[in-house]
Swiss-Prot record:
Function: Functions in the biosynthesis of branched-chain amino acids. Catalyzes the dehydration of (2R,3R)-2,3-dihydroxy-3-methylpentanoate (2,3-dihydroxy-3-methylvalerate) into 2-oxo-3-methylpentanoate (2-oxo-3-methylvalerate) and of (2R)-2,3-dihydroxy-3-methylbutanoate (2,3-dihydroxyisovalerate) into 2-oxo-3-methylbutanoate (2-oxoisovalerate), the penultimate precursor to L-isoleucine and L-valine, respectively.
Entry-annotated residues carrying N6-carboxylysine: 124
Gene name tied to this protein: ilvD
EC number: 4.2.1.9
Domain of life: Archaea
Cofactor: [2Fe-2S] cluster; Mg(2+)
Keyword set, alphabetical order: 2Fe-2S, Amino-acid biosynthesis, Branched-chain amino acid biosynthesis, Iron, Iron-sulfur, Lyase, Magnesium, Metal-binding
Family as reported in the entry's similarity comment: Belongs to the IlvD/Edd family.
Reaction(s) this enzyme catalyzes, per UniProt: (2R)-2,3-dihydroxy-3-methylbutanoate = 3-methyl-2-oxobutanoate + H2O; (2R,3R)-2,3-dihydroxy-3-methylpentanoate = (S)-3-methyl-2-oxopentanoate + H2O
Subunit: Homodimer.
One Pfam family per UniProt: ILV_EDD_C
One Gene Ontology MF term: dihydroxy-acid dehydratase activity
Protein name (database record): Dihydroxy-acid dehydratase
UniProt-annotated catalytic positions: 467 (proton acceptor)
């Protein structure tokens, strides 16, 4: 074993004060010579995906101790995007990713941990942990907390998206409030991340594909005993990584990130993965561009029809063999890469079984011949925009219509629920980007309202984000954003907007001279914010680069 980072705080007579403090924690003479492993635990009692993490972290500790290490646990914040949705709180969600990365870096570097096990589940927590892992570049394993079991009512499986869309149905008069109350009470039966292939679960799948979680981790439900076993085995597995000094950047490489994108395309994952994978690549100093996503989308078919686009929950994916089974299906398209388990990605794939051919379809009978995400470019989004094409009906892949412009989500939501939006419209919600929001809030309330009210031919375009639970023709991450003078800032009511998912284009059909005149008169709309949002707005970059702090 090479010299340990933790030797800095415990070797030599000069470190007697440091050792004295360690002894005050109960560290023994034997333990003071062993590898010190940090456990970044995002447990709290407000996020359903995190209420069970203390139990998982305890298992990680057991594994570390059994393998010859000393565990030291510390806390990490976590925000529930569902609870934060639809109000001012959503502006704080994406900034929390940077806080998580920063706080883990602070703990790892101050205490000179030799290795790190991250225990987290939800949308911004796991990306923040991965950003910290590649930034600090020490041996790291991520234990994702797992999905909640589906809810049930009348023999139908439910997820949180049923409740969000129920709000729109009540507004449209197609559902009674009593029925919505039943959904509210039945949809979310316990701990774990929301049940479909939303952002949290997609990022868990990306983490496993990159090689940063043990095989099978992503799809195991939160309440399964298998999750406890994986947590303990992850604690055991970190010690060999420390002894070999196999660091996070040995695992997270350009090839492993591209493997993650391939699985993302096959699953039809959340648009937020584009933002997070770009951010992880930036932290790891790996060249990755939005063009890479389009290139890979052309190579990989969409083979898993997962919620919200299709009928299958994460529980169904687990029963079908989980991510190892997806890797088996895609093996010929993947690059072989190391994983934290000690197995190569090909070995993981070859050890797997595909247990349900309907959930994990063959490459010859896909849901769609192209991957589930598309990056659009054009005069409205010169630096790109993202759409979950897997969740858009083919009949609206090509759309031209008049713009209905809103300066924030709230008035757009009111217009949707009051049916002031007309079929054929292109709803523009701007000044919701990384800097303009600030915080690039998600628009799940608005998109779910569109679905619930029953619009069939309306597209929604924003410089903000969408939830992984969003379905329908919803285009986000428009870059440059309105707050920095991007073309979306110049759109006026009635302007013609042309979207073509087949050609991957998004255009503002206005004479360039008119746009030049508008740009000369344009002034940025900046919301008055204080504290963390004020600091964030000053330093955050654009969505096409991952919205990382500069």
């Amino acid at each position: 074993m090479t010299d340990l980072r933790s030797d800095t705080i415990r070797k030599g007579y000069e470190r007697a004060p440091n050792r004295s403090l360690l002894r005050s924690l109960g560290v023994t003479d034997r333990e003071i010579e062993l590898p010190f492993i940090g456990i970044a635990n995002a447990f709290n009692t407000i996020v359903p995906g995190h209420t069970h993490l203390r139990q998982l972290s305890d298992k990680v500790k057991e594994g570390i101790a059994a393998a010859g290490g000393v565990p030291f646990e510390f806390g990490v914040i976590g925000i529930c995007d569902g609870i934060a949705m639809g109000h001012e709180g959503m502006r704080y969600s994406l900034p929390s990713r940077e806080n998580i990365a920063d706080s883990i870096e602070l703990m790892v570097q101050a205490h000179r941990f030799d290795g790190l096990v991250c225990v987290g589940t939800c949308d911004k927590i796991v990306p923040g942990m991965l950003m910290a892992a590649v930034r600090t570049n020490i041996p790291t394993i991520v234990v994702t907390g797992g999905a909640m079991l589906p809810g049930s009512s009348g023999g139908k499986d439910l997820s949180l998206i049923d409740v969000f869309e129920g709000v729109g149905k009540v507004a449209a008069g197609t559902m009674e409030e009593d029925a919505l109350k039943e959904l509210e009470c039945c949809a979310m039966p316990g701990c774990g991340s929301c049940q479909g292939l939303y952002t949290a679960n997609t990022m868990a799948c990306m983490t496993e594909t990159m090689g940063m979680s043990l095989p099978g981790c992503a799809a195991v439900p939160a309440v399964e005993a298998a999750k406890l076993r994986i947590a303990r085995e992850s604690g055991e597995a970190i010690i060999p990584l420390v002894k070999k000094n196999s660091t996070a950047r040995d695992i997270v490489t350009k090839k492993s990130l591209e493997n993650a994108i391939r699985v993302d395309m096959a699953l039809g994952g959340s648009t937020n993965t584009v933002l997070h994978l770009m951010a992880i690549a930036t932290e790891a100093e790996i060249p990755l561009s939005l063009a890479d996503f389009n290139r890979i989308a052309d190579e990989i078919p969409h083979i898993c029809h997962m919620l919200p686009a299709g009928p299958y929950s994460m529980q169904a994916l687990y029963r079908a063999g989980g991510i190892p089974a997806v890797l088996k299906r895609l093996e010929k398209h993947l690059d072989d890469c190391p994983t934290v388990s000690g197995l190569s990605l090909y070995q993981v794939a070859r050890n797997a079984m595909i247990k349900n051919e309907q959930v994990i379809r063959s490459l010859d009978a896909p849901v769609s011949p192209a991957g589930g995400l598309r990056i659009l470019f054009g005069s409205l989004a010169p630096d790109g925009a993202v759409v979950k094409s897997a969740a858009v009906p083919k009949e609206i892949w090509k759309h031209t219509g008049p713009a209905r412009v809103f300066e924030s989500e709230e008035p757009a939501m009111a217009a949707i629920l009051s049916r002031q939006i007309h079929e054929g419209d292109a709803v523009i919600i701007r000044n919701e980007g990384p800097r303009g929001g600030p915080g690039m809030p998600e628009m799940l309330s608005a998109t779910s309202a569109l679905m619930g009210v029953g619009y069939k031919n309306v597209v929604l375009i924003t410089d903000g984000r969408f939830s992984g639970g969003t379905r329908g023709p919803c285009i986000g991450h428009v870059a440059p954003e309105a707050a920095v003078g991007g073309p979306i800032a110049l759109v006026q009511d009635g302007d013609r907007i042309a979207v073509d998912l087949f050609m991957r284009t998004i255009d503002l059909l206005v004479d360039p001279e008119v746009l030049t005149s508008r740009k000369a008169a344009w002034k940025p709309v900046m919301r008055p914010v204080t504290g963390v949002l004020a600091r964030y707005a000053k330093t955050v970059g654009q969505a096409n680069l991952g919205a990382v702090l500069r």
